[in-house]
Design a protein with these regions (language model features):
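Solvent-exposed alpha-helices and their adjacent loops that cap or buttress functional pockets
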Residues: 2-4, 11-15, 27, 50, ...
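Short, hydrophobic/aliphatic alpha-helical segments
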Residues: 35-51, 149, 153-155, 301-318
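Positively charged, low-complexity intrinsically disordered leader regions
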Residues: 1-41, 45
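Conserved phosphate- and dinucleotide-binding cores of soluble alpha/beta proteins
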Residues: 185, 193-318
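Short beta-strand segments
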Residues: 23, 61, 156-160, 235-237, ...
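Short, glycine-rich nucleotide/cofactor-binding loops
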Residues: 34-39, 162-166, 243-248
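N-terminal active-site beta-alpha-beta segment that forms phosphate/nucleotide-binding
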Residues: 49-214
Length: 318
């Protein structure tokens, strides 16, 4: 992740493996803030509060949650508590349960005294694998999207599936970064993505760091942009993909898919294998969907004229 002129990952282990460093995504785009997580409870809280978010990153963060917990208590009871607390932190993203099961199944088979070292090895391995997968997604998308001429490529995306949703590179934005690196003129339409504004707060911030041209649009503007021929491709990430290809993603994704189909515009979902729910093949309406606090619709965070970050009410829900 390029921030200014320095590369970052969204999550990294400290050298002595006593804590992990994360980018506090709730502070963006107003402040770039690194915080340290030292305990299982802090990891669970960071996932629930969306200080870390994005399906792939949540999974890797959970793996580090095991490692931090094993530093204090590597017993079977501690291991079971880790699994239960982490898998219930946010239910929609299947990457979370995938990573939790991967780490738990490996640790439960080994002696307690070996679990600390192994848990850190597993977490770091999952983090590195995530980066490798995202680079591969970027290359695959690049080969799909690269034009035969040097015209501007206009791509619409919803929510945030860039660096901040993964350990690095991103899923849906990875092909965009690759196109830009190869010299193509790329312009991105960025949905604001209400109610938490991940597009406005995170995707636009990422693209700004990379110097990629972009325009933030209201969530309802996508249809008109497609109708007017101003969108060449739509690409999004995913929280969960069923075996038959059904996709669960941020609210509003379905509307973009329907309009893209109506206007004969290619619609792509970029996701690693860990986002595929191999145990699910029924109706997508039966996916467990996270229901968040209604106050997220009625409030919005912003910066006032004095540079203070404040939260304002947008209306009265009563």
């Amino acid at each position: 992740m390029l921030v200014g002129s320095k590369n970052y990952r969204t999550i990294e282990a400290s050298e002595d493996q006593s804590y992990v460093k994360i980018i506090d995504q709730t502070s963006l785009p107003f402040k770039f803030k690194i915080i340290h997580l030292r305990t299982l409870d802090e990891v669970v809280r960071a996932i629930k509060n969306m200080q870390v978010r994005g399906a792939p990153l949540i999974g890797v963060t959970a793996a580090y949650g095991f490692a931090l917990s094993m530093n204090f208590d590597s017993s079977d009871n501690s291991l079971s508590k880790c699994k239960n607390d982490l898998v219930n932190a946010r239910p929609t993203a299947v990457n979370l349960s995938w990573a939790v099961n991967q780490v738990y199944d490996a640790l439960i088979k080994c002696p307690s005294k070996e679990r600390v070292e192994l848990s850190w090895e597993l977490a770091i391995k999952l983090a590195n694998q995530d980066v490798e997968k995202n680079i591969s997604i970027g290359l695959h998308g690049y080969n799909l999207f690269k034009p035969s001429n040097k015209k501007t490529i206009n791509i619409l995306t919803h929510c945030n599936a860039g660096w901040l949703a993964t350990v690095d590179h991103g899923t849906a934005l990875s092909p965009i970064f690759k196109l830009f690196d190869e010299g193509f003129d790329v312009h991105v339409w960025v949905d604001e993505t209400r109610p938490r504004n991940q597009g406005l707060s995170l995707t636009a911030w990422e693209l700004s760091q990379y110097k990629i041209r972009h325009t933030v649009v209201t969530d309802n503007a996508g249809g008109l942009l497609m109708k007017e021929g101003l969108v060449d491709f739509v690409i999004v990430g995913a929280d969960r993909v069923a075996l038959d290809g059904q996709v669960c993603n941020k609210i509003g994704t379905y509307l973009k898919a329907v309009v893209a189909k109506e206007n004969n515009i290619p619609f792509y979902v970029a996701a690693p294998v860990s986002t595929i729910d191999i145990n699910f093949s029924g109706e997508i309406r039966n996916f467990e969907i996270e229901c968040r606090d209604p106050s997220e619709i009625m409030t919005m965070k912003g910066e006032d004229k004095l540079g203070n970050i404040i939260e304002v009410n947008l209306g009265n829900s009563t």
